[in-house]
Amino acid sequence: MVPRPDARRKERAGERKVVKTPTWHVYVVGTRDGALYTGVTTDVARRIAEHSAGGRGARYLRGREPLEIVYRRRLGERGLALRVEWRLKRRPRADKLEIVASRLSRRALLRRLEVTEQR
């Protein structure tokens, strides 16, 4: 694929363009009926608003409002966030509730889910 002319890097002699990579979060949403939903995003508030509005939100959450963020943790890279989400979604409900209640730190969450930062 050939890059579009407007997508090419514009650099001047001695200057580098700094590309800011987004910080990814894992979050757990609680619903009116006590269900838990786990997801990842770069902007938790925006994503919850999308879930609440319907259109771009998860089908699982439709009709389950009000939604409440019960847990969120900043993880950094997208790959790490996806691995944590995958492990968290496969945990029994009791484990998820314990993680939410204990407010595990990033390091403790990774250790608990047996996820390493390196792939």
Residue spans of the language-model regions?
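GIY-YIG nuclease catalytic motif and its immediate N-terminal context
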Residues: 1-56, 62-75, 79-86, 103-119
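Short arginine-rich
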Residues: 86-101
